[in-house]
UniProtKB/Swiss-Prot annotation:
Role of this protein: Catalyzes the methylthiolation of N6-(dimethylallyl)adenosine (i(6)A), leading to the formation of 2-methylthio-N6-(dimethylallyl)adenosine (ms(2)i(6)A) at position 37 in tRNAs that read codons beginning with uridine.
Name of the protein in its database record: tRNA-2-methylthio-N(6)-dimethylallyladenosine synthase
Originating gene: miaB
Binding of [4Fe-4S] cluster 2, residues: C158, C162, C165
Membership in a protein family: Belongs to the methylthiotransferase family. MiaB subfamily.
Lineage of source species: Bacteria, Pseudomonadati, Thermodesulfobacteriota, Desulfuromonadia, Geobacterales
Organism in which the protein naturally occurs: Geobacter metallireducens (strain ATCC 53774 / DSM 7210 / GS-15)
Ranges for domain Radical SAM core: 144-374
Cofactor binding mode and count: Binds 2 [4Fe-4S] clusters. One cluster is coordinated with 3 cysteines and an exchangeable S-adenosyl-L-methionine.
Length: 441
């Protein structure tokens, strides 16, 4: 390949994958690749995958099939990363003969070398886990991209082994980055114009617990909050059992810490929570919610719900609905249970019929839709501080997020990107808010 080389990245799954895709783009920029939004003109296509549910995994294979003919028509390299890559490894190269390279969740640092080999016709898979401190030194950072928000990885992996979850098998055990590296990365990002950071990890609340002498997650938040020029701090994802009183106190004491937390309950029944190996009861979860709201009364809480878990009775399911009503989530991600390889739940009996699971999922989503619309309507007439991120998808409005992580669209000058502005909310929609500048600028 000579001259300009174009890279297209398709990202499936969570915010960690979005962050990893940013790092992929940064690494390959050093190999002469610039990004394109059009896969049909790309010289290299990277598909960053998710395997949390079977549906997401099947979607990846379907997506890869689109490029078989394209590769016959012209010179094109195709790579797969992320959790499906980690899970399948060499099998992906055999199953998808038109695939050139496969890299796992711990192997991003090898990507430049693998691409160079692929350019010479060599197919490779690299999916070795690095479950020790050495992997911390291999975290590639995304380039300064000119945006006002930034994802910052603070830890990787998970040690909880919830019975339904494949994450420990495809992301590895928990390892925390050194706080000095995290703080240095954020200082550099702020110097480049970033005003908001989202701290990422499969279980951010356990940050530092396995590293002698390291800060706790609450301590890390306090250090980051002291960085001049940084306006807002967010984090995801939190495991309810690991939320400490020290962390809850941060919501009362740190104005830069945004008033939103993603707190996955997964179910409202103690028997199902126990079968899921979640490590808390319904009451313990509700006590954490109450403590968070005592610390920050206006905090908005989002969550995850799984329906159709093996053995879930109608009574168990009704407990989930009642939990949702008691918490009053702003929004949730809701899913039908999906058996995953290697997980403990995959061998459980008492499977729920698909029809019943689908019906329960519809009831969950209907209840949440009503609560979300009601919650959004409650913001109409209020004035919200919005960090302007840029132009909306429609292109004729600005968009940004409130402290509580709600998307707001409004008319304004594009030069406001990166600014905190007051927006009066005029209308609530299921997925966003509409507003107008309180003082037109």
């Amino acid at each position: 390949m000579t001259g300009e080389k174009l890279l297209y990245i398709e990202t499936f799954g969570c915010q960690m994958n979005v962050s990893d895709s940013e790092k992929v783009a940064s690494l390959l920029r050093g190999e002469g690749y610039s990004q394109t939004p059009d896969s049909s003109e790309a010289d290299l296509i990277i598909v960053n995958t998710c395997s949390v549910r079977a549906k997401a995994e099947h979607k990846v294979y379907s997506y890869l099939g689109r490029f078989r003919k394209l590769k016959r028509d012209r010179r094109l390299l195709l790579g797969v990363g992320g959790c499906v890559a980690q899970q399948e490894g060499e099998r992906l190269l055999k199953r998808v003969p038109w695939l050139d390279l496969v890299f796992g969740t711990h192997n991003l640092h090898l990507l430049p070398e693998m691409v160079r080999a692929a350019e010479q016709g060599e197919r490779r898979a690299a999916v070795d886990f690095i479950d020790n401190e050495a992997r911390l030194d291999l975290f590639p950072q995304a380039d300064e991209g000119g945006g006002v928000t930034r994802f910052v990885t603070v830890m990787q992996g998970c040690d909880n082994f919830c019975s339904y979850c494949i994450v420990p098998y495809v992301r590895g055990r928990e390892i925390s980055r050194r706080s000095v590296e995290i703080i240095g990365e954020i200082r550099s990002a702020v110097a480049g114009g970033v005003r908001e950071v989202t701290l990422l990890g499969q279980n951010v609340n356990s940050y530092g617990l396995k590293t002698p002498g390291e800060l706790s997650f609450a301590g890390l938040l306090r250090e980051i909050s002291a960085i001049d020029g940084l306006e807002r701090i967010r984090f995801t994802t939190s495991h309810p059992k690991d939320i400490s009183p020290e962390l809850i106190a941060c919501f009362a004491e740190l104005p830069k810490l945004c008033g939103h937390i993603h707190l996955p309950a997964q179910a409202g029944s103690d028997s199902i929570l126990a079968r899921m190996n979640r490590g808390y009861t319904r009451q313990e979860y509700l006590e954490k919610v109450a403590a968070l709201r005592a610390a920050r009364p206006e905090i908005l809480i989002t969550g995850d719900i799984i329906v159709g878990f093996p053995g879930e009775t109608e009574a168990d399911f009704l407990q989930t609905l009642s939990l949702m009503e008691e918490v009053r989530y702003t929004d949730i991600f809701s899913f039908a249970y999906s058996p995953r390889p290697e997980t403990a739940a995959a061998s459980l009996g008492d499977r729920i019929m698909r029809k019943e699971t689908t019906e329960r999922l519809e009831r969950v989503q209907g209840l949440q839709r009503d609560m979300t619309i009601e919650r959004h309507a409650g913001f109409v007439g209020t004035c919200q501080a919005v960090l302007v991120e840029g132009m909306s998808k429609r292109g004729d409005q600005l968009y940004g997020r409130t402290d509580g992580n709600l998307i707001v669209n409004f008319a304004g000058n594009p030069s406001l990107a990166g600014s905190l502005v007051d927006v009066r909310i005029t209308r609530g929609y299921p997925n966003s808010l509409l507003g107008e500048l309180a003082v037109f600028q």
